[in-house]
């Protein structure tokens, strides 16, 4: 079979495409490298600055279009598949839908139905837009709620893509739950794929101070809650300077991020929403992930035995106590590291995820004879 992925986030589609190729299929990923993050794509199409950059970007896509026909599945990264205004995105989407067998819209990040599920349906105890019954009113939450719920062209494209895609895919618990809430008949869950390297050497007993790593994207500080996490980590480091080492990476390319994280004991990832690629990268390296890991996320994976992540509550004192426990008891990290590696291999191995993705074809053929 032939698969085309348009747009990516954190190498998720690129890793899935690798798995599909190893299973004997054709797969192509087109997108951007993500500014300073420098992600992997097969064909890089990035928009340059100014009017000239916009024209060149449009021409590149127009030249590519004739080559993007005849695929079994075209998978769009929500509305982030191209850097155009909604009206032009719709034209490209409709063209690709017409000239390929099936189209899937995958939610890998923010989108109309995700924001709608958080703000209007209030599906979650905490999210990018609420903590319990209290709305988050920071600049990011307010701006994103307005953009995804109140901008007519954005809403119109979101509805069009959701209604005309043959399937909708959520890659994390919240994304799946929001899509399923509004489109239960056509929503599927496919886990994030992860390559699992050979078992690392640092999964034995922690020697010396506990090494805690945090990666920060400055422009997404409030969204991810890393402003709060960094504040808690500084306090913890001040209280236990001899028992922990704190490492911070800010706006670094993907490969450098992985190098800086290697050898850490704990990754402190994010608040408000469930674990994603950063946590999986860490776990595959034998690093314990401190993130959001609610029971519903494990249940969606049918996981009933292994719960290796440190589940962070959305309050500073709770975060402090969770992390303090491991700073004071580093001997408990070794088993959590082993469980982390096993969890990723069992639930997120890229070849297994590729097989799950391929199984969507049966549902597509059944629903669209």
Positions of PLM-derived features:
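Acceptor-binding helix/loop patch of EC 2.4 sugar-transfer enzymes
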Residues: 39, 105-151, 219, 294, ...
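Membrane-proximal helix-turn-helix segments that form the acceptor-binding/catalytic region
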Residues: 62-70, 91-102, 128-167
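A short, active-site helix/loop in glycosyltransferases that binds the activated sugar's phosphate group
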Residues: 114-115, 145-187, 231
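Conserved donor-binding/catalytic core segment of Leloir-type glycosyltransferases
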Residues: 188-224, 230
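Acidic donor-binding loop of glycosyltransferase active sites
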Residues: 262-273, 287-288
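Short hydrophobic beta-strand element within catalytic cores of glycosyltransferases
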Residues: 288-297
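A charged, aromatic-enriched C-terminal amphipathic alpha-helix characteristic of glycosyltransferases
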Residues: 328-362
């Amino acid at each position: 079979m032939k698969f085309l992925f348009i747009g990516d986030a954190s190498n998720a589609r690129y890793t899935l495409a690798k798995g599909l190729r190893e299973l004997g299929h054709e797969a192509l990923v087109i997108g951007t490298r993500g500014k300073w993050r420098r992600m992997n794509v097969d064909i890089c199409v990035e928009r340059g600055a100014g009017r000239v950059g916009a024209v060149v970007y449009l021409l590149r896509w127009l030249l590519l279009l004739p080559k993007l026909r005849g695929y079994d599945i075209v998978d769009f990264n929500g509305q982030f598949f191209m850097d155009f205004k909604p009206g032009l995105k719709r034209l490209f989407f409709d063209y690709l839908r017409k000239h390929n067998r099936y189209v899937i819209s995958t939610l890998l990040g923010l989108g109309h139905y995700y924001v709608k599920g958080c703000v209007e349906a209030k599906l979650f105890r905490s999210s990018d837009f609420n903590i319990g019954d209290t709305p988050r009113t920071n600049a990011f939450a307010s701006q994103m709620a307005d953009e995804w719920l109140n901008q007519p062209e954005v809403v119109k494209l979101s509805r069009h893509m959701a209604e005309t895609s043959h399937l909708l895919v959520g890659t994390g618990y919240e994304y799946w739950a929001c899509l399923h809430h509004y489109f239960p008949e056509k929503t599927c869950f496919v886990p994030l794929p992860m390559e699992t390297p050979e078992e690392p050497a640092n999964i034995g007993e922690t020697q010396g101070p506990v090494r805690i790593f945090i990666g920060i994207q400055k422009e997404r500080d409030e969204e991810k809650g890393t402003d709060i996490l960094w504040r808690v980590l500084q306090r913890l480091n001040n209280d236990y300077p001899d028992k922990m080492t704190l490492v911070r990476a800010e706006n670094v390319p993907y490969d450098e991020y992985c190098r800086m994280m290697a050898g850490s004991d704990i990754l402190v990832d994010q608040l408000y929403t469930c674990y994603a690629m950063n946590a999986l990268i860490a776990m595959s390296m034998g690093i314990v992930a401190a993130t959001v890991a609610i029971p519903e996320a494990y249940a969606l994976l049918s996981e009933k035995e292994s719960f290796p992540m440190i589940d962070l509550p959305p309050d500073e004192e709770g975060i402090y106590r969770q992390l303090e426990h491991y700073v004071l008891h580093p001997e408990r990290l070794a088993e959590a590291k082993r469980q982390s590696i096993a969890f990723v291999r069992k639930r997120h191995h890229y070849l297994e995820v590729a097989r799950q993705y391929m199984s969507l074809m049966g549902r597509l053929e059944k629903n669209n004879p």
